[in-house]
Regions:
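Conserved N-terminal Rossmann-fold NAD(P)-binding element of oxidoreductases
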Residues: 9-13
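N-terminal Rossmann-fold NAD(P) dinucleotide-binding loop
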Residues: 18-19
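Conserved Rossmann-fold cofactor-binding substructure of NAD(P)-dependent oxidoreductases
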Residues: 49-72
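NAD(P)-cofactor binding segment of oxidoreductase domains
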Residues: 72-108, 140
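Conserved Rossmann-fold NAD(P)-dependent oxidoreductase catalytic core, especially the SDR/UDP-sugar
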Residues: 95-131
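Conserved beta-loop-beta element that borders a ligand/cofactor-binding pocket
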Residues: 143-164
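Substrate-positioning beta->alpha
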Residues: 168-170, 179-201
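Mid/C-terminal beta-alpha module of Rossmann-like enzyme folds, strongest
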Residues: 196-244
Length: 258
């Protein structure tokens, strides 16, 4: 158990990260409210308050819909850009609502994709270079949050997520002649990401940015071949190449103060 009781929380996005995070907070006696688009059979017996509605609807941010969230001092936003048509604008509205509810701490899962694909070493001081529309939306969202007026903002840029139940190697082994096998990989196990989110909620510290990645950086070929063996899958078919890629690090355990 934690020495200090965890805060009560609101989670927007009760999925791959949100569900284990909600369960972890509940197990530590935190009151949890969450939002997702639709209810599944797995959600029925969750010991949390769960609201279901579409964040893209015109009335999604009416205060009445968030009455079970308004008293929670920490709000998480865990949805990726693929889940929303107008991602940055939606997160901006979420942050504006949080400020209106006097929420003191927002925690947002960003992505290391904002650094682009150029071969270089990146920590939180590196200049972003988003190459995809998704990465550009994420970077715009970060700025909206920093400008929101909420006193404590944590932006966690996650590396590529993986775990045994939902592993990217399961898709890779279905392909042939995969490119980029020699590029270093920037990954983070889901358990590490969940623990990082959990610990961040205990320590608000103004506006902060942190990369959440594992310290090891094997090549894509090395990592996915090893992971395939663990899951009793055939080795992925990587094409020979000498391509290079970025390596992502973090400046310190607490990230970069902004």
């Amino acid at each position: 158990m934690c020495a200090v009781p965890p805060p009560h929380i609101s989670i927007t996005g009760l999925g791959y990260l949100g569900l284990p995070l909600a369960q972890k907070f509940y197990q530590h006696s935190s009151r949890v409210a969450a939002i997702k688009r639709s209810l599944t059979s797995d959600d029925i017996n969750l010991p949390i308050h769960l609201d279901t509605f579409d964040l893209g609807s015109s009335d999604a941010f009416q205060t009445a819909l968030w009455r079970h969230h308004a008293d929670k001092p920490v709000w998480f936003f865990l949805l990726p850009p693929s889940s929303l048509t107008h991602y940055a604008d939606t997160v901006k509205q979420w942050a504006e609502l949080a400020r209106a509810c006097n929420v003191q701490h927002l925690i947002f899962t960003s992505s290391t994709s904002v650094y682009g694909d150029t071969a270089r070493e990146c920590d939180e001081t590196a200049t972003p270079d988003p190459q995809t529309e998704s990465a550009r939306q994420i970077l715009a969202t970060e700025q909206y949050l920093l400008d929101s007026g909420v006193p404590n903002i944590d932006i966690l840029r996650l590396g590529g997520l993986y775990c045994a139940e939902r592993h990217p190697v399961s898709r890779l082994v279905q392909k042939q002649n995969i490119q980029g096998g020699n590029r270093p990989i920037n990954i983070v196990h889901r358990n590490i990401a969940v623990e990082s989110l959990f610990q961040t909620a205990f320590n608000p510290g103004g506006r902060r940015l942190k990369n959440i990645i594992e310290p090891r950086h094997p090549t894509r070929r090395e990592f996915f071949t090893e992971e395939a063996a663990k899951l009793d899958l055939p080795a992925p078919d990587f094409a020979p190449d000498d391509s290079r890629g970025k390596i992502i690090r973090t400046v310190c355990d607490n990230g970069l103060s902004l």
